[in-house]
Amino acid sequence: MKRIEGYPAPEFDGRVLRVLAHGTVHDVDPFLMLDYFESKETNVGMGSWHPHRGIETFTYIKRGNMKEEDTINGVLGVDEGGALHLSAGSGMFHTSVPTYSEKGIQGFQIWFNIPQKDKMSKPYSASFQNSDFKHIKKDGNDVKVLTGIYEGVKGPLDKSNIGLRMLDVSVDKEIVLEREVFKKGYIYIYSGNGLINDEEELISQSAYILDEGKYHIKNI
């Protein structure tokens, strides 16, 4: 298991912690980038119009609200707990800005590499609200299925060219997660600390690239 510490990035008025980037592509392909952003202010910007091509992005809003505008669907709104999926394919332009909220904003943006055969596919964008996602609540834990299938529950994102499983996991005491053979995976600790397999501490604001096998994760 390999720990990755994030570093400040210039986007989002300097309030971005870049966790995965060029140096981790080989370890977690097709994940290209993971940015964590958080601000209690309401007037921060996330950039002007810019292009994407040959990648997918998934923006997940934990707190606050966001407005996204692109050349595919025009304006899309994302409320707290919702997400935005873009598959740039042959090319698109977009911009994203937080909308006013007394809570500020907190969330993640993840970039994925589209397989070569699909890089010139038709661009696509969609927004998902919190009510579109299903939860698995067991033993005090809460697993929100963002994409893919987990324990028979399927996430709402169904037009991805990649095929990923992403979960938002809140651990009460302990949960067991598994990285399957021939798959790549990582976990990112965005709040609190934990212990994995009773051996290594999981530190907040760090990503951990997983070897294959089962992982017993405890909240400490």
Predicted regions and their residues:
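Short, conserved beta-strand element in jelly-roll/cupin
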Residues: 50-66, 111-115, 166-172, 182-196
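A short glycine-rich, His/Asp/Glu-containing loop-to-beta-strand
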Residues: 10-62, 133-176
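A hydrophobic/aromatic-rich effector-binding and dimerization subdomain
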Residues: 107-137
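Generic beta-strand structural signal
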Residues: 76, 82-84, 94, 106-112, ...
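Extended, compositionally biased flexible segments
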Residues: 39-102
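Short acidic-glycine-tyrosine-enriched beta hairpin
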Residues: 69-87, 179-181, 185-188, 193-220
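Ligand-binding loop in jelly-roll beta-barrel domains
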Residues: 89-118, 201-202, 211-220
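A short secondary-structure junction signal
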Residues: 120-126, 154-159, 177-182, 198-199
